[in-house]
Amino acid sequence: ITNWDSHSDIADTHAMQAEIMDQPTAALINDMKRRGLLEDTLIVWATEFGRMPFLQGNGTGRDHNPEAFTCFLAGAGVKKGFSYGESDEFGYKVAADPVEVYDFNATILHLMGLDHERLSFYHNGLERRLTNVHGHVIKDVLAWSA
């Protein structure tokens, strides 16, 4: 088993990774739904970057792209069958509804019943919020009003 960090041979490695992830993830979600567990369970599938939309040098891989990538949420309180955000036609930059990491984390915390504005830590003598002062809940992905 390889990983998603495909600086070379992206076609084969991503095809293999997608096969490893696709059916088991769908089976997990369907099984949890069938057992009535999905309504109380939040599933988060995330990454910190995507891949560039063009090949790296003369190779067969792609470099990191921190500007546009995909994450998904399923289950407890997440709107079903919904896509939020959009990249440009090349998948290089965000074209609509950008989401910062702080927003994504604030939304996850909200779905877990936690007020992200009250969660903080001390660093260098300052109290800092986990979601910084910029993080906000992405209300459009919620199945109910926040």
Please report, for each region that a protein language model flagged, where it lies by residue.
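Ligand-binding pockets and gating/stacking loops
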Residues: 1-146
